[in-house]
Design a protein with these regions (language model features):
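Structural alpha/beta core scaffold segments of enzyme domains
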Residues: 1-175
């Protein structure tokens, strides 16, 4: 279990008792793999004389990418510059830190500071990037005869996979 996040507003138990009708539903959203027209792409350049990195990335989380590069490569945050290119389609699929971002920078260092560009193929998009979480929603809603919603309670179960990563963030947004 990666996250248990109770969210409470007012007193749903009392409000359910005041409702004229109570309905319980269960919804299932299957696993999905974002498939934007634009694949993941990055260009990394390790400036060998200054020992600084510049990376151009289609990441949806450029500041997280910068932090991850600094931590992984044991570098000062100020020595890493992330330039966010146009993401194009992302649908949450470009939030992850991918090995290609790190690889482009390290390959650039090995190439004497020349920029290294990595573009994933469609097949690589499906085999090396994350899918979006499948979720089961259990929802109980209490309403008045006039349609006024009095209360709603729910539970969301998400399959974050073996390496949950942004799973808790996605689950919190689902609530």
């Amino acid at each position: 279990i990666a996250l248990i996040l109770p969210v409470n507003f007012n007193n749903p138990e009392r409000m359910m008792k005041e409702a004229d009708h109570v309905r319980e539903d269960k919804f299932w959203c299957p696993v999905a793999h974002p498939s934007p027209m634009e694949p993941h792409v990055c260009v990394g350049q390790w400036e060998t004389f200054t020992d600084k990195i510049t990376i151009w990335s289609s990441s949806q989380a450029p500041f997280k990418l910068r932090e991850a590069l600094a931590k992984t490569l044991k570098m000062d945050l100020n020595n890493i510059r992330v330039i966010k290119m146009a993401t194009g389609g992302g649908f949450g699929g470009k939030l992850e830190m991918l090995p290609m971002d790190f690889s482009a920078c390290l390959l650039s260092k090995k190439a004497g500071g020349l920029p290294v560009k990595i573009v994933l193929t469609r097949e690589e998009e499906f085999t090396t990037t994350r899918r979006k979480h499948g979720m089961i929603y259990k929802v109980k809603t209490g309403v008045k005869k006039d349609g006024t919603i009095m209360a709603m309670t729910g539970e969301v179960l998400a399959d974050g996979g073996a390496y949950c990563s942004y799973g808790p963030t996605v689950l919190a947004a689902a609530m």
